[in-house]
Amino acid sequence: YKRVAILYPDTAYGRDLARLFAQEIRQQDGELIVSEPYKEGDSDFRAVIGKLKAEDLKKYGVEVQVDNDPAKTGIRQGGKKGKRLLYSPGFDAVFIPGRSLDVGLLAAQLAFFDIAVPLLGANGWNQPDFARVADRTVEGGVFADGFFAESSSPVVQEFVERYRKRFQATPSLFAAQGYDAARLAVEAIKRGATTGEGVRDFLMMQHDLPTLSGPSGFSPDGTLNRRVFLIQVKQGKFVPLD
């Protein structure tokens, strides 16, 4: 996608993801058309969508007059014949790093206002019922998460099976991160580390640490660089893309 819009929850988490996504778009020679915040928990997003359209129409978006005959088009805006403005977005996708409940409502309203482009998201989408009960307007949407319990990876499946057997529940991202942290600490101790500083030094020198995401390594600032899971909403289910 070369031209992207962002609709993000006006929270610290939402602002951070919007900023990072915008930064990555520019680094990939893409273009950010518009970035608009919304209030988490709202149910009416007309004002936000209106701002998005207004900014887009200044650049690449277009509006044309079409017949508003519900009998022919199936579109009922007032239920009367006449003319209506049909909006064609100038962007290729919309990134919405919000909670699944908000995303479902927002996606439906985007479609109502003629914004039928692919939707992208973050781990807030990864809720058990989202793919099954959300409006079909999220069909084909793609989001990223640090863990996906339905991954076909043998390492992930072994962890999920053991976790479910022990706790009678599906592991969350936090459970997976806790498991990885404990396993890496144990690995460092096995290799001879006897202090916290020793564990840190060992981990910082490795570039193929075993994690549920695959081989990983730490950057100089202490960030664990690991693969993320790309997941698509497809026919009421979450399907891994990799």
Per-range role (PLM):
Residues 1-242:
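Extracytosolic ligand-binding ectodomains
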